[in-house]
Amino acid sequence: MSAQVSLELHHRISQFLFHEASLLDDWKFRDWLAQLDEEIRYTMRTTVNAQTRDRRKGVQPPTTWIFNDTKDQLERRIARLETGMAWAEEPPSRTRHLISNCQVSETDIPNVFAVRVNYLLYRAQKERDETFYVGTRFDKVRRLEDDNWRLLERDIVLDQAVITSHNLSVLF
């Protein structure tokens, strides 16, 4: 990461991310979509355990996309949730998005900032189904002229190599 940002800018970006998390927890998906840049890349890959000797050599095992979504694809996911026909979300999940260790730095692109956060996403469904997703997110956010923000990129890295939940219908 390049140069760190001022405390005020760090605070504004953190508040944007906290607000975004609350929109997801409150199932305000249309409001959440409004926070996304038209060029959003929303990605998650499989996590593969690499041997220490391979990591030292810089060798990473191949991964595959769990999702690699555009804004249009995210809109379709949300439209499906809104139909009541998304059986993975019947009854709807209750989620809590916790983000911490927020690091913000400048990029080479004016008004675009790189953000690294650790996250814990708790999901409860039905009476006994609970899932924890833990990892790191690598986001890029864009500051608009009116000092509002848009999420430009989100790369979600799970710590878990094996996903034990029944599905991945939640948004990170």
From Swiss-Prot:
This is 3-phenylpropionate/cinnamic acid dioxygenase subunit beta. SUPFAM superfamilies: NTF2-like. One of its GO terms (biological process) is 3-phenylpropionate catabolic process. CDD domains: ring_hydroxylating_dioxygenases_beta. Part of the multicomponent 3-phenylpropionate dioxygenase. Converts 3-phenylpropionic acid (PP) and cinnamic acid (CI) into 3-phenylpropionate-dihydrodiol (PP-dihydrodiol) and cinnamic acid-dihydrodiol (CI-dihydrodiol), respectively. It holds the Pfam family Ring_hydroxyl_B. InterPro entries: 3PPDioc_HcaF, HcaF, NTF2-like_dom_sf, Rng_hydr_dOase-bsu. Keywords: Aromatic hydrocarbons catabolism, Dioxygenase, NAD, Oxidoreductase. Its EC number is 1.14.12.19. Belongs to the bacterial ring-hydroxylating dioxygenase beta subunit family. GO terms for molecular function: 3-phenylpropionate dioxygenase activity. This dioxygenase system consists of four proteins: the two subunits of the hydroxylase component (HcaE and HcaF), a ferredoxin (HcaC) and a ferredoxin reductase (HcaD). It catalyses: 3-phenylpropanoate + NADH + O2 + H(+) = 3-(cis-5,6-dihydroxycyclohexa-1,3-dien-1-yl)propanoate + NAD(+); (E)-cinnamate + NADH + O2 + H(+) = (2E)-3-(cis-5,6-dihydroxycyclohexa-1,3-dien-1-yl)prop-2-enoate + NAD(+). Pathway: Aromatic compound metabolism; 3-phenylpropanoate degradation. Coiled coil: none annotated.
